[in-house]
């Protein structure tokens, strides 16, 4: 039976007053995602160069959101905004993922370049991806590519690239405490930040330095990033009968459920070229949701959480058949 792959994602555009748009070289974000996910899934069969085994397994879920989606507007062709990283606190959940090669995730992106001439990205968060880990637990992950997901790049330590330095936190490790509906909530602070002296891009989990990406593997990120992103995404397969998947995003509940019921990102910050963290205003954020009847998001701000958003959904439901 022929199965068709379908992607659903949430995109939160950060509109710093210089640029608003789509990814360079693409008419809409879904064009990039469609090809990107296909190429990433093809890389799952690559042999591992090195692996670190965690005593409690592996876990992670991911969500997409885009900050500075593009520089396509003709009024802004000669303007550039530079970023040295991203910070956010991401809640951990264990959504239902239906099939082996389907996934649900929450993540942050650091991006430069474009699809046609070579997209360079550094990505990290949590995901559930049975095809990679052999189970349906949420796991901490990292990913990189220096050529639009074509030949270079991989998850975690599955190829040369990311350099692990921590003996306490392993990429691919299971996140064995996760949030429950109306119960305890668990999250973690994730930071990707460029060291101005060495040029290394460091990945930090809470206060632990996990490791780094050397800039030579992502040459377009050697100086800075042009886009920062946070968000959520699922990929699912259909037999063509037209029904939506039961694969969940986030907690499996809609954003309006709020705290203890919906998944969230809070304490959103981007890092400027002085390596100073800046909190974006909710007024400078625009959301793109491909299937709002299946998954949605709500943005807000508070003194305790800074700029934040709730997101997610159950997938198939009476309004999303």
Predicted regions and their residues:
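Exposed, interaction-prone regions of secreted/extracellular proteins
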Residues: 2-321
């Amino acid at each position: 039976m022929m199965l068709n792959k379908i992607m659903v994602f949430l995109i939160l555009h950060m509109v710093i007053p210089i640029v608003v748009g789509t990814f360079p070289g693409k008419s809409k974000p879904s064009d990039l995602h469609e090809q990107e996910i296909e190429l990433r899934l093809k890389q799952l069969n690559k042999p591992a160069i090195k692996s670190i085994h965690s005593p409690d397994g592996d876990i992670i879920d991911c969500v997409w959101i885009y900050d500075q989606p593009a520089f396509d507007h003709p009024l802004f062709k000669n303007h550039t905004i530079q970023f040295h990283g991203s910070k956010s606190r991401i809640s951990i959940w264990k959504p239902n993922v239906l099939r082996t090669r389907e996934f649900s995730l929450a993540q942050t992106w650091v991006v430069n370049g474009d699809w046609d001439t070579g997209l360079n990205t550094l990505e990290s968060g949590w995901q559930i991806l049975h095809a990679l880990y052999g189970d349906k637990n949420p796991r901490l992950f990292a990913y990189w590519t220096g050529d639009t997901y074509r030949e270079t790049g991989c998850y975690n330590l599955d190829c040369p690239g990311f350099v692990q330095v921590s003996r306490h936190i392993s990429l691919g490790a299971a996140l064995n405490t996760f949030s429950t509906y109306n119960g305890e909530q668990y999250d973690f602070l994730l930071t990707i930040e460029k060291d101005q002296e060495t040029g290394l891009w460091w990945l930090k989990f809470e206060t632990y330095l996990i490791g780094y990406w050397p800039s030579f593997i992502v040459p377009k990120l050697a100086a800075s990033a042009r886009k920062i992103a946070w968000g959520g995404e699922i990929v699912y397969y259909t037999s063509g009968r037209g029904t939506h998947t039961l694969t969940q995003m986030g907690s499996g509940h809609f954003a309006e459920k709020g705290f203890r019921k919906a998944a969230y990102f809070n304490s959103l910050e981007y890092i400027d070229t002085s390596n100073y963290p800046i909190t974006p205003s909710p007024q400078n954020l625009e959301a793109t949701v491909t299937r709002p009847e299946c998954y949605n998001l709500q943005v807000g701000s508070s003194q305790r959480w800074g700029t934040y958003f709730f997101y997610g959904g159950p997938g198939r439901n009476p309004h999303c058949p």
